[in-house]
């Protein structure tokens, strides 16, 4: 039975205190979210004003700081470009809060899929282990990773700003090509869906082999052609650590937004979010990490951040 607004409001309040939900509550929440996400598109339309956010990676207290800086949901409309889990200490609470907000305010928050919203990657970079540690079994990991298959791959703000986690694909020239993909599956090792979540812009022209081992690098010529073909003014993406929190590249055809400050609790970077206003005006808000909380007892070393 779907949770009432009152139930959801209670769960959101609990999660905002960094207290995870009961296993059964997570199961019900994921089922509700799945029903909502099934109705969304591979290229999900979004209206302005909206605030665009990059990687969060389980840095729960920095997500709370993001909402403090950018405005609370649902007063501010949000678009998150993936990578909610892994590496940080609070992936469970982070993804639970974002999914609960999606279920409560479905038209006010858009959550896209990142390369870490995958069964395989989360078994290596922390989310699986965190679920085991906090729940004593892998059920919650399974509920969330099953849900991840339904997340939209990209979003389109007012037919002008194209948002996605990673980057472009040599197999995809148009937004209609993306609309035709079957997204409801685990992230493949290769191919167009993989590329959208894994690719990066590069200083060299054309397509290149990605050092990540998945996706491609793409040059300014590729981004310009894609934007021209599809009537776009900008590609907004996440996926790469940038020290100022945002970084323009490729003659302002592409911007990277990264929203995890002091990434992996050691990189020393600022975070940023991108406000897109009523008239499509753009404003970046930068922020530093929230004050450090007492870290949970975890003996695993923080994995390297290059993925």
From Swiss-Prot:
Gene3D superfamilies in the cross-refs: 3.60.21.10
Active site as annotated: 116 (proton donor)
Primary location: cytoplasm
SUPFAM superfamilies (UniProt xref): Metallo-dependent phosphatases
The keyword Metal-binding belongs to this UniProt entry's keyword annotation: yes
Keywords: Cytoplasm, Hydrolase, Manganese, Metal-binding, Protein phosphatase
Cofactor(s) this protein requires: Mn(2+)
GO MF term list: metal ion binding; protein serine/threonine phosphatase activity
PROSITE patterns: SER_THR_PHOSPHATASE
Top EC group: hydrolase
Protein name: Serine/threonine-protein phosphatase PP2A-3 catalytic subunit
């Amino acid at each position: 039975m779907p949770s009432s607004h009152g139930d959801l409001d209670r769960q959101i309040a609990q999660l905002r205190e960094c207290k995870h939900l009961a296993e059964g509550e997570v199961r019900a929440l994921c089922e509700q979210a799945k029903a909502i996400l099934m109705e969304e598109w591979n290229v999900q339309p979004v209206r302005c004003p909206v605030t665009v956010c990059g990687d969060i990676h389980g840095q729960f207290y920095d997500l709370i700081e993001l909402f403090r800086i950018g405005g609370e949901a649902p007063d501010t409309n949000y678009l998150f470009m993936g990578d909610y889990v892994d590496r940080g200490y609070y992936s469970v609470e982070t993804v639970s809060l974002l999914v609960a907000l999606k279920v409560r305010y479905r038209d006010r928050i858009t959550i896209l899929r990142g390369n870490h919203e995958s069964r395989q990657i989360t078994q290596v970079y922390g989310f699986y282990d965190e679920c085991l540690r906090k729940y004593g079994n892998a059920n919650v990991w399974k509920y969330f990773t099953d849900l991840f298959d339904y997340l939209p791959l990209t979003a389109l703000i007012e037919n002008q700003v194209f948002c996605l986690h990673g980057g472009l694909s040599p197999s995809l020239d148009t937004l209609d090509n993306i609309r035709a993909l079957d997204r409801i599956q685990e992230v493949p090792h290769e191919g167009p869906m993989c590329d959208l979540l894994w690719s990066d812009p590069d200083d060299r022209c054309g397509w290149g082999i990605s050092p990540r081992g998945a996706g491609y690098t793409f040059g300014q010529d590729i981004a310009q052609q894609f934007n021209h073909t599809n009537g776009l003014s900008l590609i907004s993406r996440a996926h790469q650590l940038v020290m100022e929190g945002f970084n323009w590249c490729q003659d302002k055809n592409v911007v990277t937004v990264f929203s995890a400050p002091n990434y992996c609790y050691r990189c020393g970077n600022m975070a940023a979010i991108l406000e897109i206003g009523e008239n499509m005006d753009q404003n970046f808000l930068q922020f530093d990490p929230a004050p450090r909380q007492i870290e949970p007892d975890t003996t695993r070393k923080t994995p390297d951040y290059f993925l």
